[in-house]
Amino acid sequence: MKKFTQIIDQQKALELTSTEKPKLTLCLTMDERTKSRLKVALSDGQEAGLFLPRGTVLKEGDILLSEEGDVVTIEAAKEQVSTVYSDDPLLLARVCYHLGNRHVPLQIEAGWCRYFHDHVLDDMARGLGATVVVGLEKYQPEPGAYGGSSGGHHHHHDHHH
């Protein structure tokens, strides 16, 4: 079984020759991309293991290096998500504020934001005036927006309103 132990940094990835570039991919859910130890199947069906430093969070496009010198590109799996759209930047900022206030991990892009599907949150976003589309999409929340597999964080603090 191949053991992938390193992420190749962006500069080294650019320097890979065409024969060194990854031909295999590894499709992982957001939860799987937060695991430092994981048994996986590569795009060609080979079994492999991830043995990465604790706290590693993989992103789409990351390139991993195995002990044997093999390389593989990380691909984000499509997951059931809600995508909120608005042409009004202030409205989208308000939606992101309210979702963040509920400690919801968010992917934020120009004109839209995305979170794991939750019909209660969808209703809230619609109530604020945004358009919500539910479907299978790739999901990459902002770094540090989650703690473990639950997707939330667990420290205590006072909210002053």
UniProtKB/Swiss-Prot annotation:
Primary location group: cytoplasm
Subunit field text: Homodimer.
Gene Ontology biological process terms from the UniProt entry: protein folding; protein-containing complex assembly; urea metabolic process
Keyword terms of this UniProt record: Chaperone, Cytoplasm, Nickel, Nickel insertion, Virulence
GO MF entry, a single one: nickel cation binding
Gene it is expressed from: ureE
Keyword Cytoplasm: yes
Protein name per Swiss-Prot or TrEMBL: Urease accessory protein UreE
GO cellular component: cytoplasm
Function: Involved in urease metallocenter assembly. Binds nickel. Probably functions as a nickel donor during metallocenter assembly. It is not essential for urease activity.
SMART domains: UreE_N
Compartment annotation: Cytoplasm
Family label: Belongs to the UreE family.
Tagged with keyword Chaperone: yes
Top-level taxonomic group: Bacteria
InterPro entries linked to this entry: UreE (IPR012406), UreE_C_dom (IPR007864), UreE_N (IPR004029), UreE_N_sf (IPR036118)
